[in-house]
Amino acid sequence: MKDEKSAGNDARRVGEEGLFDALAEDNIQTLENCDFQHILTTDPHTYNTLRNEYPSKGGVYSVKHYSTLLMELIHSGEIEITKPLNIKGTYHDPCYLGRYNGIFDAPREVMRQCGVELLEMPRNRTNSFCCGAGGGQVWKKEHEDMKQRPSENRIEEALQTGANYFTVACPKDMTMYSDAVKTSGNEEKMIVRDLVDYVAEAMELEKFTNEETKETMSESFKVEKDASELQA
């Protein structure tokens, strides 16, 4: 969508109602000029905002999270799983996908169809544990007395399941937990992966193997590190 802006979730969560209203108004105007049936989003926060908060502003849409679409396409045969992965993974329920909107089964079904054995953490579904980024916290400075980040606590919980893969279905979760495995010293024990990566690998699509993903990420971190050293 041309001229797409943030849906406004983070603005509203930190109390910027005026900014949220402005973003919603702009997006609704833009969407009025688009020909579509559904809005697809990879972000549970955006999903919740568009589905539950835009209607009061005049924006009523059919909104889907990508995990639901993936499940539907797999069940219909439009996505063909040709190489089951045969790995062990756990799944983190995003707050705004699970507790707020009741989408628990679709991501788990996608994992199952891709050949991922699901090992549940004790805190799952409605009792899931926040990654620590919600409510605008991702933009705030951490408290200096904090002994352990919520995301690090969650990684430790995941390790107890015996899983090697930590599955996410939210971009904030990917950021928080990718960082947490490093800061907690668990890079060699747990790999954080997005749900769609399983589908791509199980479909044997190129450019989505875990080795290539890790190599790309490593190169990205190297470039950032080199840049910061040059600035210093």
Where are these regions (language model features)?
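Iron-sulfur cluster-binding electron-transfer modules in prokaryotic oxidoreductases
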Residues: 1-232
